[in-house]
Amino acid sequence: MLFYEKLEVSVAKLNKANLKKTLYYLQRNGLRETWISVRERLTETDRYFFVPCSEAELVRQSDRKWEKPITFSIVVPLYRTPEAYLNRMITSVMQQSYPHWELILADATEDHSVEEVLMQQGFLKEQPTDGETEPVAADPRLHYVHLKENAGIAANTNQALPYAKGEYIGLLDHDDVLTPDALYEMADAIIKAYDRGVKVAFAYSDEDKCDGEETRYYEPNYKEEFNYDLILSNNYICHFLVMESKLLKSLQFRPEFDGAQDYDLVLRCVAEVLTEGGQTAEKRILHIPKVLYHWRCHEASTAANPNSKKYAYDAGMRALQDHADRRHIPATATETRHVGFYRLKYKEVWEARPDVAAVGGRVLSGKNGKIIGGRMTAAGAVFYEGLPKGFGGYLHRAELSQDAEALDLRCIRIQPSCQEVFEKIVGVPYTEIRRHPGEQPVFDVTVLPLGADIRTLSLQLSEALRQRGRLLYLPEYPEEFKPL
């Protein structure tokens, strides 16, 4: 392919990736960072195809008899919701294969335009009352409330909570869509957890995005099992979220965090769970590894245009700082180069995070600057392996702080109280160096004997350290050198 042909393909691909995002990124981060980001976007391939649940499977789910069914209240704050999106959102709930739900619509629109649309679509009907008529739901599982004023999304949602009678409350935006099996999968997972003796505090699923017409699905967000330090970097939990009704009603949404009210809620719920039982209580936070939610992208949505709700990202950073302050973590919440992604900066990590046994950074090849080590699975697979320096990787996760199952010995720092564990397993005294001025210290890997099995030692050490605390992957600990 000739150069100008390659350029034409690249420009077309960039347009699809949303030119507005690129221009906004340029304003925030400058030309060099934008060039690196554009290069990364142009290497990505969009091979995602959403595969819906089959009709046969939906029938099987509908026919299932539940001995002790979980009841859900789906809460949706409405405000000037476009007619087509409103219809599709409600229909996506009505078509659930799981029957034990109710849908609560809290309408803050100043006039009765949304109410009239609901009448026209058959979701509401008029009922005579004392010589007058008032709107009532055509389906007894649907509850419509017209709020007196638009007090903001947090306050509007709070006003809907007293109407929720379910054991769990699910959060759905007024222009988004649930998959038909969403509540079935949630109920099934929560009941299985209960059978294991676990009372789920909240559960979340994977999600993707769709265009305004739901003709294209893209950018799937395949999430991890609960990862504390990842949620301190980004609200990766997001959609679809269901939370214990009692817990959500006690916490409620806080209007001062409008735009990031979901993130603030999740952070406060996480704090409740951790206060209750530390890391062992994290099993009360459940991940369902299946796309159950379509986040609709259109001109006004945050998903399509980050600049449309910049206040939301500012509120997210304030929510993170509030979480750190409430948990007495001496740290400062800061932005990263990606909107909606944050970092807690610790002056001294051991003072701030006594729950952490070790921190580790990425290991870069001295030859071409690609990731060759850092965060690993318990089996030794390297996360983000081969990713060039400067690239953020899938959903920017290579640049985000997160808990790890294993860390690479070549870029690790050990909590002082755990250093005897290091010496017992690695077989050499633990010594630290600063490879570059201004950087945090790391283990001096040069004291290892020539030919040491780095991978095996890393995995053995990590397994032992996990019994003492978290293993924290901090991508701001980069070290460039040739592999031993």
How would you label these PLM feature ranges?
Residues 90-100:
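Short, acidic, metal-binding catalytic loop of nucleotide-sugar glycosyltransferases
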Residues 181-217, 350-380, 469-471:
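Conserved donor NDP-sugar-binding/catalytic core segment of glycosyltransferases
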Residues 169:
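Short aromatic/hydrophobic "clamp" motif used to bind/position activated sugar donors
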Residues 147-164:
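Glycine-rich, basic loop-to-helix element that forms the pyrophosphate-binding segment
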Residues 22-92, 335-352:
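N-proximal low-complexity "stem/linker" segments adjacent to membrane-targeting elements
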Residues 99, 107-116, 123, 149, ...:
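A conserved acidic beta->alpha catalytic loop
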Residues 227-318, 408-409, 423-430, 445-452:
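Conserved nucleotide-sugar donor-binding catalytic segment
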Residues 162, 216-248, 258, 370, ...:
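A recurrent flexible, glycine/aromatic-enriched loop bordering the glycosyltransferase active site
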